[in-house]
C-alpha cells in the first residue's frame, strides 16, 4: 500500500491551530469530492492551509517526482505557499519558481525533484520548455 500523507491533526498542532474556521472546515469536506473548488475569503483567513490539507492527502511520500503544480499570480504568493508547506513539516519537498530571480537558481533546486512546484505561470512554462522538471 502506498504511503500517503494523512496526519492533518499533527500538522494543525504543529502550527498551533486548535480549531478550524468555518471556511477551512468546509474546504476540508468539499475539496476531496470537488477538486476544482474555489475558496473565496478575506486575506488572512487560512485559505492556503484550507486547500493544502486535502490536496496533500493525494500525494505519495515515496514518489520522487513532481506530483503537484500550484500556479499563482505573484511571486509573493508563491513564496508564502512554499513557506506554509515547509512550516507544516509534511516531508514533501516544495520549490517556488517565479520571475525576478536567476533561472539558474531555479534549475539547481528543481534538479532535486520537488514533490510540489509552486510558481507563476510564465516561469513554470519557461521551465517546462527548458525541461527543468519531468511531468511523467
Please report, for each region that a protein language model flagged, where it lies by residue:
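Glycine-rich, flexible loop/turn motifs
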Residues: 16, 129-131
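Short aromatic/basic micro-patch
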Residues: 22, 50, 118
